[in-house]
């Protein structure tokens, strides 16, 4: 070891690259090999020098800085190395040592400094190993260091970082939170940056030079940005760049001969040891903007381009984060914008070079640990998923206009405030043109498979059957009837489960399908007619229940009355409401239905139907035209008058009419909305008159009176 050191120190012109002890620091490991805390020395194995570097915490950043400074670049090409350059390097080393003077063992460092300067003088012999003269606090670590030889990398252990108080507990910065620091202590730069001794080298720092003490920040900067700068390291990229950009007279990339083999062994061992000690210094790679003399960053793949905007040493590289105290908060916005603009592609050239307001691509790489990277990405992807769902909601909101789920309590129907109805144009065009043929068993406009994919609210429940799709649960509010073989038949049962047929004679059922049961077998199978599909077949009896019908005496009273009023209107739809009466409930339901129907008014106009008002109830039938009567299968929907709780027209636009019905068995209510070319006041008065007659007949039947004649 003495011969090698004397050759390295006193070589003079024979070995120009070895004139300064700091020349080989930047190639301690290959360019593609990254360590979180690399303190290995290539040209020296001196225990005292290694211990000083351990105490000062010299890591990748400082070694890169010492080897990349332009004022010292002359050492790479000078013959014997100037004494002034060596003095500047020694002063920088002393500053690093003085910066940690308030830590335990600072008085002991002065003795090591004298030995170190004596070892660096040209022609000096190897430094003395004085383990017996070391203080008690350093005895154990020094004795371990002296037992190592040049090839004893297998027994090398870090000595000082575990005993010095170099890592005070300070509040976590936003950057360490973003990088998933699992209880990691801050690096030594935090303590150095907050120290009272500034940089005393007396030289002007180049504008783009990386200074590990302050990172191009003024000394009076606060501790929070200093912490961010201290935890960011771009040394893997810059070290490989500096190695390739070195002048021809610079040091080789790897030592020759068997020295390189032992050096590789030591580096491999250090990788195993130092990765376990990452709880002391936790460094993550950050993409640094290229200097004027450096090529574009092609050493890192695109996925390793950057970890956090707040840890970048050059604020000008990401102008979008200017003025924001916590740039990492905008990572949700980044995922939001990236998803909303899928056509953006990453520009060539390795890392992302974004302009103002343009976010980077979502994939991020973390070289710290697999578990932290997975946890970070899972949270990120969860946020992205949440933002993407919000995107879909926002994209549909312009279609709905002023629709909102909280409109149940709305009392003003703004869309009806205008003089003309939003459906007047569509209604006028439809009456001018030939009437469109409707399916025989379809009065519902609930859904059509050939329509555009429009998402409706789940609260919009249509009353009528649809021959093209399954029916909705609001159909159970009334009774379905159709003409079969010239005779009108009402439904007797309602399907409560979906039944998929497995044989040819079985009948397919959907929930709430109206059924006319014709035969009930002893094996609990029904033979029935599905009024929605017009098919016949058998199905299990427990898949349907019997509908509630009016009592026979009420049906007899209704038959005795031949009073019926008919009105031609257009059915808009039905919606379930929370209350059974009230103008505010009626207006809110009209607003919801009208807003939703406005999406389909052009390609699926409202159904033309006939409202028949009688003492028995309200019947909604298909418009009586030739095209429908030719089908021979006229269908209608019937609501018993006793189940109608409220009706009326809109106070601001009397062309809209609606009535609220109660479910025959459940405590549920639905509002059915219609629109007409003319005023619907007559329709509302007709329903009121039907109520009066129904009440009169009901009272006469339930409370009969006897005439008492007094003599």
Curated annotation (Swiss-Prot):
Annotated tissue distribution: Highly expressed in brain. Expressed in neurons, localizing to neurite tips in differentiating cells. Also expressed in the pancreas, testis and prostate. Low levels in heart, ovary and small intestine. Decreased levels in pancreatic beta cells sensitize cells to IL-1-beta-induced apoptosis.
Effect caused by changing residue 161 to G: Abolishes MAPK9 interaction
Domain PID: 561-700
Biased composition (Low complexity): 14-25, 139-149
Composition bias, Acidic residues: 105-116
Single GO MF annotation: mitogen-activated protein kinase kinase kinase binding
First and last residue of the signal peptide: none
Biological process, per Gene Ontology: JNK cascade; negative regulation of intrinsic apoptotic signaling pathway; negative regulation of JUN kinase activity; positive regulation of JNK cascade; regulation of CD8-positive, alpha-beta T cell proliferation; regulation of DNA-templated transcription; regulation of JNK cascade; vesicle-mediated transport
Domain observations: The destruction boxes (D-box) may act as recognition signals for degradation via the ubiquitin-proteasome pathway. A minimal inhibitory domain prevents pancreatic beta cell apoptosis in vitro, and prevents activation of c-jun by MAPK8, MAPK9 and MAPK10.
Function: The JNK-interacting protein (JIP) group of scaffold proteins selectively mediates JNK signaling by aggregating specific components of the MAPK cascade to form a functional JNK signaling module. Required for JNK activation in response to excitotoxic stress. Cytoplasmic MAPK8IP1 causes inhibition of JNK-regulated activity by retaining JNK in the cytoplasm and inhibiting JNK phosphorylation of c-Jun. May also participate in ApoER2-specific reelin signaling. Directly, or indirectly, regulates GLUT2 gene expression and beta-cell function.
Family: Belongs to the JIP scaffold family.
Protein name: C-Jun-amino-terminal kinase-interacting protein 1
Organism: Homo sapiens
Gene behind this protein: MAPK8IP1
